[in-house]
Amino acid sequence: MATKNLAEDPYEKLANAIIVQASKDYMSNLRKKKRNPGSASAEHDIKECERFFRSGWYQVLTSVDGEYLMNRLRKEALGTK
């Protein structure tokens, strides 16, 4: 009986791709807001990403804590410790 390799599961790949794209979007908008603090579009997109990372849909896609991930992404995007 063959074992299932989750790394090759197309649904797992899709879930990972969704999270990776949301992470890139979040970091990009954090940097945009840092360069231009008055950017309403960056603020809107940041809130949208944060809503996703706190959503039930996010929890279906991964077991990684959304708050933990947002904190890590913020530190990386803004160069803070």
Where in the sequence are the language-model features?
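Short intrinsically disordered terminal tails
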Residues: 1, 78-81
